[in-house]
Amino acid sequence: MTVDAYHEIRRRALERIDGSGLDPQRDTARLIELLRATVDDYQRHAHLGETRSLADPDATVRRLLQSVTYFGPLGDLLARDDVEEIFIEGDRVTFLEAGGRLRGLDVPSSESENRQVVERLIAATDRRLDASHPVSQARILDGSARLTAVIPPVSDHLSATIRRYALRKETLASLVELGSLTRGAADFLSLAMSASTSVIVSGPPGAGKTSFLSALIAAVPSDHCVRACEEIRELHVPIVHGSYYEARPPSLDGGGEISLRQLVKATLAMRPDLIVVGEVRGGEAFELTRAVNAGCGLACTIHANSAPDALDALVNAALMAGENIPERVVRKVFGSSIDLVIHLERDIEPKDGGIRRQTMEIRALVPSLHEDFSSEPLFRRDRLGGPLEWTGSMPPTSLVRRLERALPGQVNLTQVLEGAASW
């Protein structure tokens, strides 16, 4: 069946549905009869020589049924566990498999059909996608995926990405198995999370920042209170003591919005040991200055090309709050309270073409008399695919004291950094 043939049959079927007053979601039996009648009509015209006949009419009926009542050309992709991301650009659909290979969809689709699927996914949420809200993000499929969609006039055509959340439970140990961390680095980070340190995870899009943040949360002791705030819920690590909070867009009348900054501000009054922000992008960073000043631990992700860039990006985000606080003050607050920056990178695996995600360095901030941040690499990987090694450096004295308080008497921090002793 050609793409043009499918789209013509689908157009006729939709016209019949509209004219019949049929509710496709409630009367499946009548819908199937209508779709089969539409396909039979097309076949009769084909036998008269007006067009090419369908090789498998039953398959066409099933495809139409999926388009009208389910998720159309995306249905099979959304049902697969090995698909990480789906990219929709007009009538084109590509997807990223778990191994990192990008493939094209071999099922015919059109922009109108793809948009109908996207709108159907968003309709099940409290978000909107229309002329007044041409950019939308939503947690879809019972929270198992995130949809980001843009439509004209903001974009030339429908442009959407569906990101599936990893079904596996990320832990620091699993990151060791994947080659992103060494045992020494994982043990050190586990120790850091038990001591309520403030950690930033940085990297480009797709580097695995959210998965890494999940692994850090999983290492937090169960008696610590964790408050996790996100624009769109992506983290799903079980929290024994604490909760997750999700921002809310404005309603149709423009009211009811709950921003990420408001959520972070609210959690400060809830006695957190650790505040988690899924992704820092704007004014919520200013509220984090209050959090770290209050002695709370912090864990967040931020887009950046290096660990030093991540610190600058955090300051710039805090200044976006418009509180007229001098930049030097913001830098001083973050410089004296952030403990670690973990930078991740991604590239294409040379052997099989899959995506490789690895930790490039773990840096500790050190006290500085200047406005600029000062940091020291504790673990470093010179290149993607190379070994992640302890540099021999130790964290600043204040952090060492906090970490060693959490260690059993027979183990010291040097042994942990060397990977010679777990704790």
Question: Where are the regions that the model predicts?
Answer:
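Helical/strand "switch-coupling" subdomains that flank nucleotide/phosphate-binding cores, especially
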Residues: 287-290, 333-361, 367
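P-loop NTP-binding catalytic core
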Residues: 80, 96-195
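Switch/coupling sub-region of P-loop NTPases
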Residues: 199, 215-335, 345
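Conserved lysine of the Walker
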Residues: 209
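Residue-level signature of catalytic and energy-coupling elements of molecular machines
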Residues: 13, 86, 149, 275, ...
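The conserved Walker
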Residues: 204-206
